[in-house]
């Protein structure tokens, strides 16, 4: 299994909602749709905080005060049709922007990223209840723990 390190950022708005991106990827068992926080793979030799700041800049076109990591999480999943042994370094940031927009994403990312929007902790819980795939699975609790909700 190929190791992977990624930086994820819980970006909060003034109301305590977190910004999530709806993604669609092809896996060996077919199409997989899910919501997750901003972020991506840490480049070789890159520090996690540097990667988190880069991902926010690339995906939102913003320079935010990114803090952390506030926690790390280990998981395994299929990425680009290959199983990955992943460690997420999770950070927090605050954003005053009303309407989130994806900027600076690559053509490959555009094909994968379908939608971006703010979610309250209650909306995250309701999404889970409807059967939506939202990562991390304990996002609502993490939102409340780190300043949202």
What does each model-found stretch correspond to?
Residues 17-19, 69, 90-95, 149:
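A generic structural signal for ordered secondary structure
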Residues 23, 39, 121:
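Active-site donor-binding loop signature of nucleotide-sugar glycosyltransferases
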Residues 72:
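Structured alpha/beta reader/binder surfaces that contact nucleic acids or chromatin modification marks
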Residues 40, 87, 146-148:
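Juxtamembrane/interface motifs at transmembrane-helix termini
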Residues 35-43:
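Short histidine-centered catalytic/ligand-binding loop motif
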Residues 42-65, 75-130:
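Unchanged
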Residues 1-36, 64, 68:
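N-terminal strand-loop-strand
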Residues 130-149:
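Charged phosphate-binding loop/patch that engages nucleotide di/tri-phosphates or the phosphate backbone
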């Amino acid at each position: 299994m190929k190791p992977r390190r990624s930086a994820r950022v819980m970006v909060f708005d003034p109301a305590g909602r977190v910004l999530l991106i709806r993604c669609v990827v092809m896996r060996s068992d077919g199409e997989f749709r899910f919501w997750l926080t901003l972020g991506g793979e840490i480049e070789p030799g890159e520090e996690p905080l540097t990667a988190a700041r880069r991902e926010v800049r690339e995906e939102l076109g913003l320079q935010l005060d990114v803090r952390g990591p506030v926690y790390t999480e280990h998981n395994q999943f299929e990425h680009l049709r290959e199983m990955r042994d992943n460690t997420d370094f999770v950070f927090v940031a605050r954003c005053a922007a009303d309407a989130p927009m994806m900027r600076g994403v690559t053509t490959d990312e555009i094909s994968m990223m379908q939608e971006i929007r703010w979610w309250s902790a209650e909306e995250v819980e309701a999404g889970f209840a409807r059967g939506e795939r939202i990562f991390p699975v304990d996002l609502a609790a993490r939102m409340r723990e780190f300043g949202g909700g």
